[in-house]
Amino acid sequence: MGEEYAIKCDRFTRKFGKLTAVDGIDLRIKKGELFGFLGPNGAGKTTTIKMLTTLLTPTEGEATVAGFDIKTDAALVRSKIGVVPQEFALFKELTAMENLWYIGELFGMKKDELERKSEELLKIVGLYLKKDILTESFSGGMKQRLSVAAGLLHTPEILFLDEPTTGLDPQSRIAIRELTQKLNATGITIVYTTHDMEEADKLCKRIAIMDYGSIKAEGTPHELKEKYGGGHRIELELGPHDEQLLEELKTVANANEVSQENGIVVIHVTSVGGGLIHTISSFLAKKKVKVKEMDITEPSLEEVFINVTSKQVRD
């Protein structure tokens, strides 16, 4: 059986003078995962990516990427990864196709292979019909999609996307997210950094929440919400009932709290698993209390972030 992990980090640290930008993180990212680093600007996400892509050397700790040590096998690491940085690394005086040809030549790709691969990637990112247009006229979203194509030219095993939707309009953001999911479905491991909670929730299979250089929590979006979100909220609009019902509901639902807000009964529970909704519905049916409407709200990643970092999200 081959190596299970695309990326492994142990005690991964980077200091700039007295400032510790990344503080001894331990991390495992499985092959084929779409893994997200979530956190505000200054959390250490980009510094972590720069170390994993060999642009920065860690002050302490070890890491392997695609099975190679980032310190001793940096060239081999670079041959296995694609990188799409925050800033567009494109030449505005070149066309979309010419940009890819130039970058492919830097990888040492042969002409026939480069032309074939460039056409294939431009079709994948939806820019084939724009291949002969100068990139200076491209929108931010088009430039980002072209940057993704450039990062895929040499068929990497792992693709790093650093804040790829920052500053883009809503349509372009959706296009980049859909492209990311499409690429991940082909088996490419994707490491995705963002400070957008909703984006991370919808896109990433697993997430590491970073702040001040440390990983504060890690897991699937569902796991993070269950563990750190503060519980679910069940709202019930009920028919006529006596005041004692709220206390009975608290016991039946094993609730943290049951209250009434503007005529709506609100049940706060840690989890809605284990047939809880059926239990509540059956109890109310036996009490002959009509349920006019029921709404279940799960905690958001923003609530998770606030709970694990004890503060509001920064820009």
Question: What is each residue range found by the language model?
Answer:
Residues 14, 27, 236-238, 267-269, ...:
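Preference for bulky hydrophobic residues occupying beta-strand positions
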Residues 78, 122, 225, 305-306:
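Conserved protein kinase catalytic domain
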Residues 4-217:
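ABC transporter nucleotide-binding domains
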Residues 272-315:
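C-terminal coupling/interaction segments
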Residues 1-4, 314-315:
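Short, Lys/Arg-enriched, disordered terminal segments
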Residues 10-12, 258, 294:
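Generic beta-strand hydrophobic packing signal
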Residues 177-270:
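ABC transporter nucleotide-binding domain
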